[in-house]
Amino acid sequence: PGFEHYRFDLIYIDGDHTEEAVFNDGLSAFMVCRVGGYILFDDYEWREETKRGIDRFISVHANQINIIKKGYQVLVQKTSN
């Protein structure tokens, strides 16, 4: 059992900092984030690998999110499925 039947207003991502893990965490979060909800990525400016994973997520979902803040943390709002 997982979270696939739930929808969340805010999801905070601060786990494995490899590019692939951050990207996959973003994809998983996007699936369970409600439209209008937020995904917050930590450590964007900490390691290049982490930054690449977050940038990949943003690129894939560019038409479905708004970037609210981009600094040490990145906050995006989901605008559509």
Regions of interest found by a model, annotated:
Residues 2-11:
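A short acidic, Gly/Pro-enriched loop at the edge of an enzyme's catalytic core
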Residues 19-81:
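C-terminal substrate-binding/active-site "lid" region of AdoMet-derived donor-dependent transferases
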